[in-house]
Swiss-Prot record:
Protein's gene: QPT2b
Source species of the chain: Nicotiana tabacum (Common tobacco)
Protein name (Swiss-Prot/TrEMBL): Quinolinate phosphoribosyltransferase [decarboxylating] 2b, mitochondrial
Catalytic activity: nicotinate beta-D-ribonucleotide + CO2 + diphosphate = quinolinate + 5-phospho-alpha-D-ribose 1-diphosphate + 2 H(+)
Associated pathway: Alkaloid biosynthesis; nicotine biosynthesis; Cofactor biosynthesis; NAD(+) biosynthesis; nicotinate D-ribonucleotide from quinolinate: step 1/1
GO biological process assignments: alkaloid metabolic process; NAD biosynthetic process; nicotine biosynthetic process; quinolinate catabolic process; response to jasmonic acid; response to wounding
Length: 351
C-alpha cells in the first residue's frame, strides 16, 4: 500500500550526496540491539568496524550525486510497503545487517521479518516487509540485497556441507572477499559451520612457506613455541602436514618437547580417483596415527560430493575455501507494492 504524507519524511544524505568514506578499522563497537540480541552473533574482531563497512557500501553506491533515478521518478513525500521475496530455496542470512542498513538510511523505516537468520525459505515465500518512505527504501535496496544475497548463499552452502560432514565440523578459511571477512564468517556461523582463524593475529598457522623458511617442521614448531613463551601469548597453534612422514615428524617433536601445538592440518590427503570417487586411506592413516593427541583438520579436494566420506574418517574439522571464495548468491528480491508505480505515474503525469 502507499500513501502521500506531508513532507516530513527523512531523506538521508545518501539519497542526495554522500561524502567519500574510508573504512576505519577501529575497535568501535557496533551498537545495534538486533545484533546484540541474536543467537548467532557476528564473530569477534579487535579492529573490524562493521558499521563503517556498511557505511562504505552505501557511500560507494551514492557517489557524489546520490540516486539520480529516484530523484527523477519517486516523489519525496511518498510512503509505501516493500516485501522481501525468496526466488529460490535456501538459508536466509543477513537480517540483522539489513536492519542496520535501513536504519542508517532512514531510522523511521519499519522492518518486519517472518523468519530468522538461519531459517530455510522456499521459492515464492515473502519473508519480510519494509514500511516507510519509498524513496529511502529504494536507496537502501541494492546494498541490503548485496549483503543478504551473499550471506544467504554462504549460509546455504555451509548448511549443506555441515550436515554432510557430520560428525566432523565444517570450517571456512581466510579466502574471503576483501573488506567482508567478518560478514562472510558470520554467514558461515548462521549456516551451522564453525569459524577458522579470523586473521593472522588470532592463531599461529604454520604452513609450507613457514616450514621451508624455518628449515623444517620441527624447527618451525620450536621457533613458534619460543616466540609464544617470550611474548606470553596463549593462542592456538596449527601446523600443516602433507605426508604421513611429516605427521610422524610433528608427533616426534611433540613427544619430546612441551609444545603449544593444538591442531594438525592434513593437507591434500584426500586423493581424487578417475571414477569420480575419492581415496581417503592416507587421511585415515594420519588420523589413526595422531590418535586424538591433537585436533585434526582435513583440507584439499573438499566438495559437497566428497565431504561426507571425509567426515567419516575421524577428522575433527574439514576446511573449505569454496564456502566463501566461490559464493553463489541466493536469489532474493525486494519489491515495492505494485500500486506505487501507478501512483508515481499519476503524480508525474506519466500514466
Amino acid at each position: 500500500m502507499f500513501r502521500a504524507i506531508p513532507f516530513t519524511a527523512t531523506v538521508h544524505p545518501y539519497a542526495i550526496t554522500a561524502p567519500r568514506l574510508v573504512v576505519k578499522m577501529s575497535a568501535i563497537a557496533t551498537k545495534n540491539t538486533r545484533v546484540e540480541s541474536l543467537e548467532v552473533k557476528p564473530p569477534a574482531h579487535p579492529t573490524y568496524d562493521l558499521k563503517e563497512v556498511m557505511k562504505l557500501a552505501l557511500s560507494e553506491d551514492a557517489g557524489n550525486l546520490g540516486d539520480v533515478t529516484c530523484k527523477a521518478t519517486i516523489p519525496l513525500d511518498m510512503e509505501s510497503d516493500a516485501h522481501f521475496l525468496a526466488k529460490e530455496d535456501g538459508i536466509i542470512a543477513g537480517i540483522a545487517l539489513a536492519e542496520m542498513i535501513f536504519a542508517e538510511v532512514d531510522p523511521s523505516l519499519k522492518v518486519e521479518w517472518y523468519v530468522n537468520d538461519g531459517d530455510k525459505v522456499h521459492k515464492g515465500l515473502k519473508f519480510g516487509k519494509v514500511q516507510g518512505n519509498a524513496y529511502n527504501i529504494v536507496i537502501a535496496e541494492r546494498v541490503v540485497l548485496n549483503f543478504m544475497q551473499r550471506m544467504s548463499g554462504i549460509a546455504t552452502l555451509t548448511k549443506e556441507m555441515a550436515d554432510a560432514a557430520h560428525p566432523a565440523y565444517i570450517l571456512e578459511t581466510r579466502k574471503t572477499a576483501p573488506g567482508l571477512r567478518l560478514v562472510d564468517k558470520w554467514a558461515v556461523l548462521i549456516g551451522g559451520g564453525k569459524n577458522h582463524r579470523m586473521g593472522l593475529f588470532d592463531m599461529v598457522m604454520i604452513k609450507d612457506n613457514h616450514i621451508s623458511a624455518a628449515g623444517g617442521v620441527g624447527k618451525a614448531l620450536k621457533s613458534v613455541d619460543q616466540y609464544l613463551e617470550q611474548n606470553k601469548l596463549q593462542i592456538g597453534v596449527e601446523v600443516e602436514t602433507r605426508t604421513i612422514e611429516e605427521v610422524r615428524e610433528v608427533l616426534d617433536y611433540a613427544s619430546q618437547t612441551k609444545t603449544s601445538l593444538t591442531r594438525i592440518m592434513l593437507d591434500n590427503m584426500v586423493v581424487p580417483l578417475s571414477n569420480g570417487d575419492i581415496d581417503v586411506s592416507m587421511l585415515k592413516e594420519a588420523v589413526e596415527l595422531i590418535n586424538g593427541r591433537f585436533d585434526t583438520e582435513a583440507s584439499g579436494n573438499v566438495t559437497l560430493e566428497t565431504v561426507h566420506k571425509i567426515g567419516q574418517t575421524g577428522v575433527t574439522y574439514i576446511s573449505s575455501g569454496a564456502l566463501t571464495h566461490s559464493v553463489k548468491a541466493l536469489d532474493i528480491s525486494l519489491k515495492i507494492d505494485t500500486e506505487l508505480a501507478l501512483e508515481v505515474g499519476r503524480r508525474t503525469k506519466r500514466a
